[in-house]
Amino acid sequence: MKILALDLGKFNTMCCFFDTKTRKHSFLNAPTERNYLNNLFKKHKIDIVVMEACGPSGWINDLANIHGLKTLVCSTNEDACRVFY
């Protein structure tokens, strides 16, 4: 499975491409812009897009769905995202 994990920012987004079979990963710093992410979704073979729930996650989720990509939007405010010591 090829995962694209997005750390969304207002102006820039950090992209992590991860292949679960080979366990190889790569990073890309990308602008948080519709045209750029549209081309990114077209260019790369991605099985699922994972992102945090925040301002731009709505339109990025819609854009990924237009490309037929599965998405997982996570709330970082829930217990599942917290580390307990």
Task: Please report, for each region that a protein language model flagged, where it lies by residue.
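Phosphate- and other anionic-substrate recognition elements at nucleic-acid/protein interfaces
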Residues: 1-85
